[in-house]
Regions:
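Catalytic cores of carbohydrate-active enzymes across secretory and cytosolic contexts
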Residues: 1-240
Length: 240
Protein backbone atom coordinates (compact mmCIF):
# COMPACT_ATOMS: atom_id res chain seq x y z
CA UNK A 1 0.00 0.00 0.00
CA UNK A 2 2.47 2.65 1.13
CA UNK A 3 1.62 6.26 1.99
CA UNK A 4 -0.28 6.78 -1.27
CA UNK A 5 -2.23 3.57 -0.77
CA UNK A 6 -3.52 4.72 2.60
CA UNK A 7 -4.47 8.09 1.12
CA UNK A 8 -6.34 6.33 -1.70
CA UNK A 9 -8.25 4.10 0.73
CA UNK A 10 -9.17 7.13 2.81
CA UNK A 11 -10.43 8.92 -0.30
CA UNK A 12 -12.56 5.90 -1.14
CA UNK A 13 -13.93 5.73 2.39
CA UNK A 14 -12.41 2.31 2.99
CA UNK A 15 -11.42 1.43 6.56
CA UNK A 16 -9.89 -1.90 7.55
CA UNK A 17 -9.13 -3.57 10.86
CA UNK A 18 -5.81 -5.08 9.73
CA UNK A 19 -3.14 -3.63 7.45
CA UNK A 20 -0.65 -5.99 5.82
CA UNK A 21 2.86 -4.86 4.92
CA UNK A 22 3.75 -7.39 2.25
CA UNK A 23 7.55 -6.85 2.25
CA UNK A 24 9.33 -3.87 3.73
CA UNK A 25 8.69 -1.43 0.90
CA UNK A 26 5.03 -1.30 1.95
CA UNK A 27 5.88 -0.34 5.53
CA UNK A 28 5.58 3.41 4.95
CA UNK A 29 1.82 2.91 5.11
CA UNK A 30 2.34 2.98 8.87
CA UNK A 31 3.81 6.49 8.62
CA UNK A 32 0.55 7.74 7.16
CA UNK A 33 -1.52 5.73 9.61
CA UNK A 34 0.36 7.28 12.52
CA UNK A 35 -0.19 10.76 11.09
CA UNK A 36 -3.91 10.10 10.63
CA UNK A 37 -4.28 9.00 14.25
CA UNK A 38 -2.37 12.05 15.48
CA UNK A 39 -4.75 14.27 13.52
CA UNK A 40 -7.60 12.63 15.43
CA UNK A 41 -6.11 13.93 18.66
CA UNK A 42 -4.24 10.86 19.91
CA UNK A 43 -0.78 11.06 21.43
CA UNK A 44 2.12 9.52 19.54
CA UNK A 45 2.28 6.55 21.92
CA UNK A 46 -1.46 5.95 21.60
CA UNK A 47 -1.23 6.13 17.82
CA UNK A 48 1.72 3.75 17.76
CA UNK A 49 -0.16 1.24 19.92
CA UNK A 50 -3.12 1.26 17.53
CA UNK A 51 -0.90 0.95 14.46
CA UNK A 52 1.09 -1.91 15.94
CA UNK A 53 -1.90 -3.93 17.10
CA UNK A 54 -3.48 -3.73 13.65
CA UNK A 55 -0.31 -4.24 11.61
CA UNK A 56 1.09 -7.41 10.04
CA UNK A 57 4.47 -7.62 8.30
CA UNK A 58 5.41 -10.50 6.00
CA UNK A 59 9.01 -10.87 4.89
CA UNK A 60 9.97 -13.09 1.96
CA UNK A 61 13.68 -12.51 1.45
CA UNK A 62 16.22 -14.42 3.59
CA UNK A 63 19.28 -12.45 2.42
CA UNK A 64 20.37 -8.94 3.49
CA UNK A 65 20.40 -7.67 -0.12
CA UNK A 66 16.64 -8.09 -0.26
CA UNK A 67 15.99 -5.60 2.54
CA UNK A 68 16.02 -1.95 1.48
CA UNK A 69 18.15 0.52 3.42
CA UNK A 70 18.45 4.24 2.71
CA UNK A 71 21.30 6.67 3.34
CA UNK A 72 20.26 9.34 5.81
CA UNK A 73 20.82 12.21 3.37
CA UNK A 74 18.62 10.69 0.69
CA UNK A 75 16.00 9.62 3.19
CA UNK A 76 15.83 13.04 4.84
CA UNK A 77 15.37 14.74 1.48
CA UNK A 78 12.06 12.92 0.99
CA UNK A 79 10.88 12.15 4.52
CA UNK A 80 11.79 15.15 6.69
CA UNK A 81 8.29 16.63 6.48
CA UNK A 82 6.78 13.35 7.67
CA UNK A 83 8.96 13.44 10.77
CA UNK A 84 7.62 16.93 11.45
CA UNK A 85 4.03 15.75 11.00
CA UNK A 86 4.70 12.97 13.51
CA UNK A 87 6.08 15.48 16.00
CA UNK A 88 9.40 13.62 16.12
CA UNK A 89 12.94 14.88 15.92
CA UNK A 90 14.75 13.69 12.83
CA UNK A 91 16.98 11.45 14.95
CA UNK A 92 13.99 9.79 16.62
CA UNK A 93 12.41 9.17 13.24
CA UNK A 94 15.63 7.62 11.90
CA UNK A 95 15.87 5.43 15.00
CA UNK A 96 12.57 3.79 14.08
CA UNK A 97 14.42 2.20 11.17
CA UNK A 98 17.66 1.34 12.96
CA UNK A 99 18.54 -1.96 14.60
CA UNK A 100 20.57 -0.02 17.15
CA UNK A 101 18.81 3.27 17.97
CA UNK A 102 21.33 6.07 18.29
CA UNK A 103 23.88 4.51 15.94
CA UNK A 104 24.28 7.46 13.58
CA UNK A 105 26.24 5.35 11.09
CA UNK A 106 23.29 3.04 10.51
CA UNK A 107 21.02 3.53 7.50
CA UNK A 108 17.23 3.55 7.66
CA UNK A 109 15.92 0.02 7.11
CA UNK A 110 12.33 -0.39 5.97
CA UNK A 111 12.40 -3.91 7.39
CA UNK A 112 13.34 -2.65 10.85
CA UNK A 113 10.68 0.04 10.57
CA UNK A 114 8.10 -2.62 9.67
CA UNK A 115 9.12 -4.77 12.64
CA UNK A 116 8.87 -1.77 14.97
CA UNK A 117 5.42 -0.76 13.75
CA UNK A 118 3.75 -4.17 13.33
CA UNK A 119 2.73 -6.48 16.15
CA UNK A 120 2.87 -9.59 13.95
CA UNK A 121 5.90 -10.51 11.83
CA UNK A 122 6.17 -13.69 9.80
CA UNK A 123 8.28 -15.52 7.26
CA UNK A 124 6.81 -17.74 4.58
CA UNK A 125 7.90 -21.19 5.77
CA UNK A 126 9.01 -22.84 9.01
CA UNK A 127 12.67 -22.63 7.99
CA UNK A 128 12.35 -19.08 6.73
CA UNK A 129 10.76 -18.11 10.03
CA UNK A 130 13.81 -19.46 11.87
CA UNK A 131 16.18 -17.67 9.48
CA UNK A 132 14.25 -14.41 9.93
CA UNK A 133 14.41 -14.70 13.71
CA UNK A 134 18.19 -14.82 13.43
CA UNK A 135 18.35 -12.03 10.84
CA UNK A 136 16.23 -9.67 12.95
CA UNK A 137 17.68 -10.58 16.37
CA UNK A 138 19.41 -7.21 16.85
CA UNK A 139 16.09 -5.37 16.73
CA UNK A 140 15.07 -6.84 20.09
CA UNK A 141 18.15 -6.49 22.26
CA UNK A 142 18.28 -8.75 25.31
CA UNK A 143 16.24 -11.56 23.77
CA UNK A 144 17.30 -14.79 22.12
CA UNK A 145 16.22 -15.06 18.45
CA UNK A 146 13.67 -17.76 19.25
CA UNK A 147 12.09 -15.48 21.87
CA UNK A 148 11.12 -12.86 19.30
CA UNK A 149 7.62 -12.63 17.92
CA UNK A 150 8.76 -13.52 14.39
CA UNK A 151 6.63 -16.46 13.28
CA UNK A 152 5.81 -18.09 9.97
CA UNK A 153 3.11 -19.18 7.60
CA UNK A 154 3.53 -21.85 4.96
CA UNK A 155 3.07 -20.47 1.47
CA UNK A 156 0.98 -22.67 -0.77
CA UNK A 157 -0.70 -22.64 -4.15
CA UNK A 158 -4.21 -23.33 -5.41
CA UNK A 159 -3.59 -26.58 -7.23
CA UNK A 160 -6.43 -26.42 -9.82
CA UNK A 161 -5.22 -23.04 -11.12
CA UNK A 162 -1.49 -23.62 -10.56
CA UNK A 163 -0.98 -27.02 -12.18
CA UNK A 164 -1.39 -27.22 -15.95
CA UNK A 165 -4.00 -29.68 -17.22
CA UNK A 166 -1.37 -32.14 -18.51
CA UNK A 167 0.08 -32.57 -15.02
CA UNK A 168 -3.36 -32.76 -13.48
CA UNK A 169 -4.26 -35.64 -15.80
CA UNK A 170 -1.04 -37.46 -14.89
CA UNK A 171 -1.71 -36.96 -11.17
CA UNK A 172 -5.33 -38.10 -11.46
CA UNK A 173 -4.25 -41.21 -13.32
CA UNK A 174 -1.51 -42.20 -10.88
CA UNK A 175 -2.58 -40.72 -7.53
CA UNK A 176 -6.26 -41.60 -7.52
CA UNK A 177 -9.45 -39.66 -6.89
CA UNK A 178 -8.57 -38.82 -3.28
CA UNK A 179 -5.60 -36.66 -4.30
CA UNK A 180 -7.64 -33.58 -5.25
CA UNK A 181 -9.16 -33.40 -1.77
CA UNK A 182 -6.08 -34.33 0.24
CA UNK A 183 -3.07 -32.73 -1.41
CA UNK A 184 -1.10 -32.45 1.84
CA UNK A 185 -1.08 -36.24 2.29
CA UNK A 186 2.56 -37.24 1.80
CA UNK A 187 1.60 -40.88 1.35
CA UNK A 188 -0.25 -39.96 -1.83
CA UNK A 189 2.72 -38.01 -3.16
CA UNK A 190 4.91 -41.07 -2.63
CA UNK A 191 3.08 -42.63 -5.57
CA UNK A 192 5.09 -40.39 -7.89
CA UNK A 193 7.92 -42.92 -7.61
CA UNK A 194 5.69 -45.49 -9.30
CA UNK A 195 5.21 -43.32 -12.36
CA UNK A 196 7.40 -44.30 -15.31
CA UNK A 197 10.22 -41.87 -16.03
CA UNK A 198 9.20 -41.89 -19.69
CA UNK A 199 5.69 -40.67 -18.83
CA UNK A 200 7.04 -37.75 -16.83
CA UNK A 201 9.60 -36.90 -19.49
CA UNK A 202 7.07 -37.00 -22.32
CA UNK A 203 4.81 -34.65 -20.37
CA UNK A 204 7.69 -32.22 -19.84
CA UNK A 205 8.61 -32.34 -23.53
CA UNK A 206 5.04 -31.69 -24.62
CA UNK A 207 4.74 -28.72 -22.28
CA UNK A 208 8.08 -27.31 -23.40
CA UNK A 209 7.00 -27.50 -27.04
CA UNK A 210 3.76 -25.76 -26.10
CA UNK A 211 5.70 -23.01 -24.31
CA UNK A 212 8.03 -22.47 -27.29
CA UNK A 213 5.07 -22.14 -29.65
CA UNK A 214 3.57 -19.56 -27.29
CA UNK A 215 6.82 -17.57 -27.12
CA UNK A 216 7.12 -17.54 -30.91
CA UNK A 217 3.53 -16.36 -31.30
CA UNK A 218 3.92 -13.55 -28.73
CA UNK A 219 7.25 -12.47 -30.20
CA UNK A 220 5.78 -12.33 -33.70
CA UNK A 221 2.78 -10.39 -32.42
CA UNK A 222 5.09 -7.89 -30.71
CA UNK A 223 7.19 -7.51 -33.87
CA UNK A 224 4.14 -6.79 -36.02
CA UNK A 225 2.82 -4.26 -33.53
CA UNK A 226 6.14 -2.41 -33.20
CA UNK A 227 7.27 -2.84 -36.83
CA UNK A 228 10.57 -4.41 -35.87
CA UNK A 229 13.43 -5.43 -38.13
CA UNK A 230 12.23 -8.49 -40.13
CA UNK A 231 15.66 -10.11 -40.45
CA UNK A 232 16.31 -9.69 -36.74
CA UNK A 233 12.89 -11.14 -35.95
CA UNK A 234 13.42 -14.20 -38.13
CA UNK A 235 16.88 -14.73 -36.67
CA UNK A 236 15.44 -14.77 -33.14
CA UNK A 237 12.54 -17.05 -34.09
CA UNK A 238 14.84 -19.52 -35.84
CA UNK A 239 17.10 -19.59 -32.81
CA UNK A 240 14.36 -20.51 -30.36
Amino acid sequence: LGIGGIAALKKLGVEKEIYHCNEGHAAFLNVQRLIDYLRQGLSFNEAMELVRVSGLFTTHTPVPAGHDKFDEGLFQHYMNDYANQLGLSWTDFMNMGREVPGDLTEKFSVTVFACNTCQEVNGVSWLHGKVSQDMFKNIWQGYFPEESHVGYVTNGVHYPTWAVSEWQKLHDKNFGEEFRGDQSNTNIWEKIYNVADEEIWETRKALKAKMIDYIKAKYTESWLKNQGNPSRTMSVLNGI
